[in-house]
């Protein structure tokens, strides 16, 4: 396993007409840290006092327009949206040609808006850093944040350099260069399996499945399905980074259908199927919606069973009608898959608190989901029921048997056993 080149190419993105002092300082820090800054100017009205690697005209051209047309668009929102489109297309092309080892962008709200788009299209594990006056604020929708994005508050910045600003910018530049130098790209030595889960207090199948899959010569990447983890899982699936997936925690679909902010976006449970990756699916935690524990419970859930996991996140069970709706959404997503799908239904419960005597146990509501799934899936999906809880050994053994059968049939590539 090797890291990037000793002089990683770092895209430095900002409006050079208004932030030239800061951007030139950042370029200098990147060079002193051993990186190669690639300046991308996203100015609109003015010009930077330096020659960028990619000018605002290059950015506009990448959006299929001109700087003058962008100026004539009528307002700063439309203008920056067009520059974001162009900068995103430009960086995407550079990345596809292997010319991007990392990115760092600087901005207030306009620059951050643009930078979020660029970070979102870069592959997972390419270091991404945004220095922003609105870092980690409520202005940033979770669905726009790349799953491996790093941010730092541009404290004391916005209008020229000062000691605080220099400290912030130098930290950020050192971080992105260090990450680009030391990052280990995923190994191709063994085929990679994707798996979703919640913490082991809720779901436990990975304790059995991970070592068994590793014995068979696979690497296993497990994603914490609390919004950002699902986004990372979907990003790798979209890149065709898995040979198969065990998508056993699909609660993020329930979250999305219930309006929770703990979302992984509208494409949850879609990218693996679209990429032709074989999927083994189970309804882990599909009975719950996650909400921030520090916010008031929404009115529609105030009479539902509630479990506070910690001070950050709480789980609330959804009604039988909501579970039926989620089942229909899940079935529709899976039916579009371009590779085999096996859906395994554990009839004894779908998370640890869904047991007799536990606070979130609602067998009638679980039955509503199971009934809807039975009727919603078509013949393109293999449908199996296990008379056991999702955390029982019988469930994990059934899932492993499906996987082994697929390997024997050539549906999944064989593992690399040393």
Curated annotation (Swiss-Prot):
<dbReference type="InterPro" id="IPR008322">
    <property type="entry name" value="UPF0261"/>
</dbReference>
<comment type="similarity">
    <text>Belongs to the UPF0261 family.</text>
</comment>
<dbReference type="InterPro" id="IPR044122">
    <property type="entry name" value="UPF0261_N"/>
</dbReference>
<dbReference type="InterPro" id="IPR056778">
    <property type="entry name" value="UPF0261_C"/>
</dbReference>
<protein>
    <recommendedName>
        <fullName>UPF0261 protein BMEII0128</fullName>
    </recommendedName>
</protein>
<dbReference type="Pfam" id="PF06792">
    <property type="entry name" value="UPF0261"/>
</dbReference>
<dbReference type="Pfam" id="PF23189">
    <property type="entry name" value="UPF0261_C"/>
</dbReference>
<dbReference type="InterPro" id="IPR051353">
    <property type="entry name" value="Tobamovirus_resist_UPF0261"/>
</dbReference>
